Amino acid sequence: MKIGLISPYAWDVPGGVQAHIRDLAYYYLDKGHQISVLAPASDESSIVENFVVSAGRPVAIPYNGAVARVLFGPVAASRVRQWVAGGDFDVLHLHEPAIPSLSLLACSIAEGPLVGTFHAAAPRQKVTFAIAPFLEPVIEKLRARIAVSEIARETLRIHLDTDALVIPNGISKEFYEKAEPNPAWKRDLTIGFIGRFSEPRKGLNVLLEAFSRIALALPEVRLLIAGPGEGVEAMESVNPALRSRITFLGRIDDVAKASLLKSISVYVAPNTGGESFGIILTEAMASGVPIVASDIPAFSHLLEEGKYGLLFDNENSSDLADKLIRLLKDKDLAQKYSRSGLDHAARFDWNQVGDEIMNVYLHARGEDEKVTLLSDARPWSRLFTRGEEE
């Protein structure tokens, strides 16, 4: 099958949606399918995958408590049109087609076997509310809609009064399960955090507030932090006497991330909101590391209300400290969560998730139908393809 995938976000900026699309592409390539991915890119030379086509440089906009780098407008529409016209796709899979992006452009320009995946969880998305009347006739063109979680599904219902099939984000369970720990990182009583800690919603400040109390109860405890951001600035809130126990590793690749998860005693996800899934939690479970996470809806649902990890009261650093101390002291409890998490991680393996998505493709495609372009006479096509005539 010839499959076209569209990323709304810049390919050269790390993010959960981009990682999902990349891994899905590799999974289908391994199955013998032909894949092409269209994505914005700030630096085209940084793209290493030969199946990725750059649609141009994105612009940064505030979105869902973070900064999204997206591409939109008539020039971008022209590039989408050229890519679709030359792709001869059996199915076109659009990610986040409800925000101004390449995916929305493609949904307006193309017709046929179109599938949309909705990742975001934001009940008060101002942008989507503002353009909802224009979105509805476009989103209706999707033959199938996927939401990565019940939280994302509910967001779709609120904004666009439509429903979706829930298929979670995928991971390679074997990749994380078989990773080797890093001797420089592995030590008892080690807490790990991975994320863009420059974004307040990732909750690093909550973890750092909790760390002082944890250190009093467990003098040997230490904290490893990985991800983009300024470690010096983050450390300003930490007691100087404790700073030697905290190490900032900077941005790390997937191999180092898997090794880090194998090297720590507990993974903590103190995110305060804006999450629809929690891919890092599935990766941690696949690594066999017990989890302490905030009780935001996405994490509570993923961990089944504490069945697969300890939950603490969101933004409550005292409760976070109590839960981490409890898990670090109670080896039996930690082992229980390690085993149950490993079992639960199988639900998110690409061997299952990829096959579920393929079934959606087959249902959307019907009898050997192809993705085609709409006529220029259609209103949405005229709106988004004016750049071709300039």
Question: Where in the sequence are the language-model features?
Answer:
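Short hydrophobic beta-strand element within catalytic cores of glycosyltransferases
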Residues: V266, P290-A293
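Carbohydrate-associated surface elements
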Residues: I151, G170
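Conserved donor-binding/catalytic core segment of Leloir-type glycosyltransferases
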Residues: P183-K202, L208-S212, L224
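N-terminal strand-loop element at the rim of the active site
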Residues: S7-D12, R22, Y26-P74, P228-G231
